[in-house]
Amino acid sequence: MMGRSETLQDKLHMFHRAFNHPTGLKYPLPSAIVDSEKALRRTLIQEEYKELMYAISNEEDDEVLKELCDLVYVCVGFAVTYGWAFDTAFNRVHKSNMSKLDEEGNPLYREDGKVAKSNCYQPPKLSDLVG
């Protein structure tokens, strides 16, 4: 029997343990720890975003893909740092995004091509995952 495959969250837990990064920080924490950890996470996300934009502007598809993965990596790492159930949250956000279809199951679009919310839209409930 095959075991379950590792999720993104599992892989980031492995990375955090290997590199002595925090996992599952719970409140209340001293504000200095919270502030420094959030500052680090913000910086990592900004750096990866800039690298992604650079790769896109240079039309380097392999680099775009790498930077997309790096950006997802640091974003999931943020959730792991605070012990948030990223995989559960992602599934709820996906379900919420799928609720943007109208009653007939058709997508709605804004003028710029972005998917619009129908009257069927249900926002995700995530507050139970971050406390």
Map each language-model feature to its residues:
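Flexible "arm" and connector segments at domain edges
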Residues: M1-L68, V72-G131
